[in-house]
Every structure is written in structure tokens, then in C-alpha cells.
Regions:
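Adenine-nucleotide phosphate-binding core of ATP-dependent small-molecule kinases
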Residues: 267-271, 280, 284-332
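Catalytic phosphate/nucleotide-handling subdomain of diverse soluble enzymes
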Residues: 223-265, 274, 280, 343-390
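N-terminal glycine/serine-rich phosphate-binding loop of ATP-dependent small-molecule kinases
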Residues: 1-104
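Short beta-strand-loop/turn "lid" adjacent to the catalytic site in phosphate-handling enzymes
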Residues: 76-128, 147-149, 155-166
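Glycine-rich beta-strand-to-loop/alpha-helix junction loops that act as flexible
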Residues: 10-11, 97-99, 214-216, 339-348
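Internal helix-turn-beta structural module
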Residues: 311, 315-337, 346-430
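Phosphate/pyrophosphate-binding loops at sites that engage ATP/ADP/AMP, CoA/4′-phosphopantetheine
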Residues: 75-92, 198-203, 325-337
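Glycine-rich phosphate-binding loop of actin/hexokinase-like ATP-binding domains
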Residues: 159-260
Length: 430
């Protein structure tokens, strides 16, 4: 029987793969990533478990996610010190992260029908599903004996009530076209819920959290009794908080004024305005890069910002996050077990955590400065940075792990059940 599970996380400019043992719990064997696909030369990071991380700039031309995935797979298969994954026959399953799953509430195994359904969603999320679907197509063609399982960032939020996910537009059109709030970062939120509930020694179904996944893409989720009841992202990941290149929430008509001569907005002036143009502007030409010229938040979140624009970008993000924290605190009736920071920025930026915590002191939020500045150790999944026990919600840092979440499993008689908290996919051990 095949011995490993391959987890794949594909973005527009990067592809990450991780091999895990096919056991309960799974153990990482090797991790490899190529970034900079859209800004050559591409960069490789590769590490076998227990060994030193290898990094290099590649001379190979890797211009698509498929190119990067094929390179990574060959690199791992050809590695003499990685005997566990020498060929396709060593793979039990391939687990793919797909951002937008539409109405799928659970993970699914890819077949002709499910693939057709996901391809139909490309019109709904052309900027977000493309890379993942390209790699799924490649796997079906070149690794046909290995089943592919898809896990959706949107599925975790299927528990949101109708009044949260419904947009006040013509419902005949909305339902025919799937126009509603979906929410994203669900794979991360599922991992965080499971990890934080265990840390707090509470059942997931009795856990109330406000969780911030703050990275180059940023969102917030409110979890009540172990279920998502609202989140900042919407029909697409563009809604909600600003990001490195995303605008976040704006007046919907702004984009038409943005692309027309000032003061000359008219039906004639906007007739050539296309959805693809608007998405390009708001997804890739906005956010803190538009304000500061950099996507690196570490250059923005500093005690003495290099410019007023950098300070403005930081203040905007803080302001927008505070709005959601207040909203979600009320939605939980003040019964909040923890305020959780996660994502690359949430985990690393002590200044952002301190600033937000100070501005939330009216909610009983307080942090230990030393613990906050130190941050979590590499092997510390959840770290408590609260100050003063029992005076308000705990303040935690959770180092989320979407790759591992794709392969978390539990034994179930003759089956192994992959489960992200999004619903199970039963996988035969035969």
C-alpha cells in the first residue's frame, strides 16, 4: 500500500507541497516551495524533516503553477535521501487546497462531475481558483492512479446564517448565479479552532473565538460554539480587510470613478469598463502596496515609519480590524473565550498585536508585553500572551498550518477519514 499523502497549496505566484506519512497522526516527511513564479528568477525552498533548509534561486524557466509543481515533484522523486517518495506509486492521495468551493460544504474527491463543477466556479473566482485547478488537471493527467481530494477555504463558513450570507439584491438573480457571502481562509480557521480549543481544554462546540488571519490576504472570523457565524470576506476574498494588494471594503461604485476621467462619469464613459479590469485594480493594484509601494508589512509595522504613507497604511488596517472586533464581540454577547492572532503578520507583528490590544482595553483585553514581544517558539502552536487571568478574553497567537490541516486524519474502522472540521471524506485503506 502507498505510504504517503501529498498536500498541495497553489497560489498565483507560488506553489508549496508537503509530503506526510499515511498514518494517524500524519508526520511531515519533506516540504518544498517555489515562489516568484511571476517575478523571476523563481526561488526554491526545500527541507527534509530533521535536516537543514535548502534555498536557492533557480535557473529553470518556471512560468506557470504547473511548471513549478512538476519541478517540485521531480526534485523530490529524484532525491536519493527521500526514499519514501521515489515515485507515483508511493502516493496514497493528493490533497489540494482550493479557495472557492461554491456551495460545497465538505471536502470532495475529484472525478469528472466534481471537476466540472469546480470549473464552472472559475467565472465566480477567476483570480483565486486558477492555480489550484491547473495543478489538479495536471495530476489527473500525469498521476492518474493517485486520487485527488479537494479542501475548500469557503466550506468552513457554510454554518453562517442566511441573514449574514445574503446580499440584499434580487434573489432570483443572486441564487441563479451563486451571489452571496462565502468567506475564506476556512482551512486555517478550522486548524485554529481545533488547536485553540485543545489549548483551552474546551470542547470545540463550546468554544467562542474572534480569530484574525492577518497576512498579505487578511480576514477575521467569529466562531460561536465551534461554528463560523460571520467572517469579513464575502463573495470573493476581496471583501473585508485591506491586504497587500487588495482594497478590502470600498464603495462599490468607486471603481467606475477610478477608471474614468474625474467629473466625467457617465454611462458612455463607463461602457468599456469590464469586470476583469475592476478585479485587477482592486485585487492587485490596491492595498498597502498602492499606499506605500511595498507589499512587505514588516516595512510598515515599525515604531518609526519611514513615511506618512506607511503610517497611514498601518492605521487603516488597525481601524478596519477594530471595526470587526467590535462587531463580533457584540455578536458573541461578550462571551469571548479568546482573541486569536494568526497568519504571517498576525503571528510575527508584535506592534500590530500591541496596538490592537491597547485599543481594545475597554473589552477587558490586556497583553503581557514581554510575552508579546517574544512571540511563539517554532514548535509552539498556541501561545498565550494575555495579562491578568480571568479579567477578559484570553489573547492568543496561533501558528496556523494549512498544509497539515489538509492531512489531519483519524482512524475509523476500515477507513481513514480526512477531516478539516469541514466535514469528512472517507478514504479506503484497501
Amino acid at each position: 500500500m502507498a505510504k504517503t499523502v501529498l498536500a498541495v497549496n497553489a497560489g498565483s505566484s507560488s506553489v508549496k507541497i508537503t509530503f506526510y506519512t499515511f498514518e494517524n497522526p500524519p508526520k511531515a516527511i519533506a516540504d518544498a516551495q517555489i515562489s516568484g513564479i511571476t517575478a523571476p528568477p523563481p526561488a526554491l525552498k526545500f527541507q527534509r524533516t530533521g535536516s537543514t533548509k535548502h534555498q536557492e534561486k533557480l535557473q529553470e524557466k518556471l512560468s506557470t503553477p504547473q511548471d513549478a509543481f512538476k519541478y517540485l515533484l521531480k526534485r523530490c522523486f529524484d532525491d536519493p535521501e527521500l526514499s519514501e517518495v521515489a515515485s507515483e506509486s508511493d502516493l496514497a492521495y493528493i490533497c489540494h487546497r482550493v479557495v472557492h468551493g461554491g456551495d460545497y460544504q465538505d471536502s470532495v474527491e475529484i472525478n469528472d462531475d466534481t471537476m466540472h463543477h469546480l470549473e464552472a466556479l472559475e467565472d465566480l473566482a477567476p483570480l483565486h481558483n486558477f492555480s489550484a485547478l491547473e495543478i489538479i488537471r495536471l495530476c489527473r493527467k500525469e498521476l492518474p492512479s493517485v486520487p485527488s481530494i479537494t479542501f475548500f477555504d469557503s466550506a468552513f463558513h457554510h454554518t453562517m446564517p442566511d441573514y449574514v450570507r445574503t446580499y440584499p439584491i434580487d434573489q432570483t438573480i443572486a441564487k441563479a448565479n451563486g451571489l452571496r457571502k462565502y468567506g475564506f481562509h476556512g482551512i486555517s480557521y478550522s486548524f485554529i479552532l481545533r488547536s485553540v480549543a485543545e489549548f483551552l481544554q474546551k470542547p470545540q462546540e463550546k468554544t467562542n473565538l474572534i480569530v484574525m488571519h492577518i497576512g498579505s490576504g487578511a480576514s477575521i472570523c467569529v466562531i460561536k460554539e465551534g461554528k463560523s457565524i460571520d467572517t469579513s470576506m464575502g463573495l470573493t476574498p476581496l471583501a473585508g480587510l485591506p491586504g497587500a494588494t487588495r482594497s478590502g471594503d470600498i464603495d462599490p461604485s468607486l471603481v467606475f470613478h477610478y477608471t474614468s476621467d474625474a467629473g466625467k462619469l457617465s454611462p458612455t464613459a463607463t461602457k468599456e469598463m469590464h469586470i476583469s479590469t475592476a478585479e485587477e485594480i482592486l485585487n492587485k493594484k490596491s492595498g498597502w502596496k498602492a499606499l506605500t509601494g511595498t507589499t512587505d508589512f514588516a516595512e510598515i509595522a515599525v515604531e518609526s515609519p519611514p513615511s506618512e504613507a506607511h503610517k497611514l497604511a498601518f492605521d487603516i488596517l488597525v481601524d478596519r480590524i477594530l471595526g470587526y472586533i467590535g462587531n463580533y464581540y457584540v455578536k458573541l454577547g461578550g462571551e469571548v473565550d479568546a482573541l486569536v492572532f494568526a497568519g504571517g503578520i498576525g503571528e510575527k507583528s508584535a506592534l500590530l498585536r500591541r496596538t490592537l490590544s491597547e485599543k481594545c482595553k475597554s473589552l477587558g483585553i490586556a497583553i503581557d508585553s514581554e510575552a508579546n514581544d517574544k512571540g511563539p517558539e517554532d514548535d509552539e502552536t498556541v501561545k498565550d500572551i494575555s495579562k491578568g487571568a480571568g479579567k477578559g478574553p484570553r489573547v492568543l497567537i496561533c501558528q496556523t498550518n494549512e498544509q497539515f490541516a489538509l492531512t489531519q486524519a483519524r482512524d475509523n474502522d476500515e477507513w481513514l477519514t480526512c477531516n478539516l472540521g469541514l466535514g469528512p471524506v472517507k478514504i479506503s485503506l484497501d
